[in-house]
């Protein structure tokens, strides 16, 4: 369940926010609890009945399209505010068959937006146990190393204000669930994640894409 990890993350984030706002924990709970929750969600924490409502996340106001999708694994799921799914269900993920050349999903805005950060949450097989154990019985079915669902190679490109497509990110050998890419601010009309390969599965799986213009 990783309850110690989840609790530690929540306490540490709350302490940092108290320091940032120069308030006591009781004041944080009374006046800033929603901000704390949203910050935890942004860092891939999961809170029951709380979804992404981050006003700074520009992906939330974008339209979403994709090269293809599996039944029930709609492209719009990547901005529904949730990054967990019940096993075998696709209520909060975009999914598409892994093919030669990969699959893409794209965010588009009505007009150009200024971006300098893109955050992606991939599927890392949270439904499957991954524990440290000296027991052969417990370890027998545990998959070590990069999880099979994980997108391995991917690219990010965008259409700029002139209508030209530009390359932005090219990643090989990814094994991380949460990826943040930061770059010099750019004007963007649309942003495309092109998932090329996975580590083992036959489906491309993405939970969420967020887009930000960082505040100095």
Positions of PLM-derived features:
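Glycine-rich phosphate/pyrophosphate-binding beta-alpha loops
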Residues: 1-3
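Internal hydrophobic alpha-helix adjacent to the cofactor/substrate pocket in enzyme cavities
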Residues: 6-23
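Short clusters of small/polar residues that mark proteolytic maturation junctions
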Residues: 15, 169-170
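Non-catalytic terminal regions with compositionally biased, polar/charged low complexity
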Residues: 19-54
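Extracellular/surface-associated beta-sandwich interaction domains
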Residues: 33, 50, 56-62, 87-88, ...
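Predominantly extracellular/luminal regions of secreted and cell-surface proteins
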Residues: 54-84
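Aromatic, loop-rich ligand-recognition surfaces of beta-strand-rich domains
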Residues: 85-167, 173-216
């Amino acid at each position: 369940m990783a309850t110690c990890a989840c609790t530690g993350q929540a306490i540490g984030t709350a302490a940092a926010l108290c320091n940032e706002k120069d308030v006591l924990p009781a004041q944080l709970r009374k006046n800033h609890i929603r901000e704390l929750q949203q910050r935890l969600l942004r860092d891939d924490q999961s809170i029951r009945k709380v979804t992404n409502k981050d006003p700074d996340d520009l992906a939330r106001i974008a339209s979403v399209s994709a090269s293809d999708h599996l039944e029930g694994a709609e492209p719009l799921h990547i901005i529904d505010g949730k990054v967990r799914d019940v096993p075998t269900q696709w209520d909060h993920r975009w999914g598409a068959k892994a093919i030669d050349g990969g699959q893409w999903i794209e965010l588009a805005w009505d007009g150009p937006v200024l971006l300098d950060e893109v955050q992606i949450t991939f599927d890392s097989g949270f439904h499957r146990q991954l524990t440290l154990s000296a027991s052969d019985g417990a370890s027998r079915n545990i998959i070590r190393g990069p999880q099979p669902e994980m997108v391995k190679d991917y690219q990010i490109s965008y259409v700029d204000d002139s209508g030209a497509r530009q390359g932005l990110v090219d990643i090989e050998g990814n094994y991380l669930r949460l990826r943040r890419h930061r770059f010099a601010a750019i004007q963007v009309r649309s942003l495309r994640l092109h998932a090329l390969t996975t580590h083992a599965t036959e489906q491309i799986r993405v939970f969420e894409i967020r887009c930000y213009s960082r505040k100095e």
